[in-house]
Amino acid sequence: MKPSHTIRPVFDDPNLVSTAGLVPVLALAESAGLYDLLTRLSVPSPNAGAKSVAVIGGMLAGADSIDDLDLLRHGGMPRLFAGVRASSTLGTFLRSFTYGHVQQLDAIGGDLLAGLTARVPGVIAGAQDLQGFACIDVDDTIREVHGYAKQAAANGYR
């Protein structure tokens, strides 16, 4: 006999946290100036900085789709991170990005790397004598988007 359903682990216990490792990582990002840098982002959306940090945190925790960003709201996560938006809100936020906004995020990433270098020696070899070089390779995959709920969407990044 085979069961007609699959078991899916869910972290809904208010005392459990599935991704506690985000706490030191986001604290380091904050000390390197991430939150101040995100104020330069000109996306026409309220609280763009908080939404950006939520997306970054979700990606660090393994979210690879907009729906997966909901993992930041399960279990005891609201005790650790205040103001995490719903995944549908974050999806609307991400869909408002233009090419110029992506370039702004690229500049913010470069400035954040400089801030991290000042706090974590050795992130870039040779950073002390200004001869350091860092190459960060982040690949994306563009795929067709299908589905009744995806009106007016042709391509998506993954």
Ranges and model annotations:
Residues 1-158:
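Dynamic "connector" segments at or just before major functional cores
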